[in-house]
Design a protein with these regions (language model features):
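HIT superfamily nucleotide-processing domains
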Residues: 1-115
């Protein structure tokens, strides 16, 4: 998609602090990190959100989930990390190109407060 900021980053049209790239996937540091280590893993193929994914994306999604721990370890997250996929406006998605946030380092608070 020509006007998608993540597509532009994956094509090298917008600079980023690259973590990883191959023919299908691209990972880069978040410009507004919420933790000492915070990067995103995206498919080069434009898929707007997890709601748009279908069975044709199974292998791609599997590769993303299997690559995330490898990249997390390479970024120094040996003690654990969090993966977040915000989906749709109601789920907090801000950029409508499927992406996985890999977050860690320091103390990561609980996702949801238990009462």
């Amino acid at each position: 998609m020509s006007d998608c900021i993540f597509c532009k980053i994956a094509r090298g049209e917008i600079s980023s602090r690259k973590v990883y790239e191959d023919d299908e996937l691209f990972a880069f540091h978040d410009i507004n990190p919420v933790a000492p280590v915070h990067f995103m893993l995206i498919p080069r193929l434009h898929v707007a959100s997890l709601m748009e994914a279908d069975s044709g994306h199974t292998a791609l999604l599997g590769r993303m989930l299997l690559l995330a721990p490898k990249l997390a370890k390479e970024q120094g997250l040996d003690n654990g990390f969090r993966i977040v996929i915000n989906t749709g406006k109601g789920g907090g998605q801000e950029v409508f190109h499927l992406h996985i946030h890999i977050i860690g380092g320091g103390h990561i608070p609980p996702m949801v407060r238990r009462s």
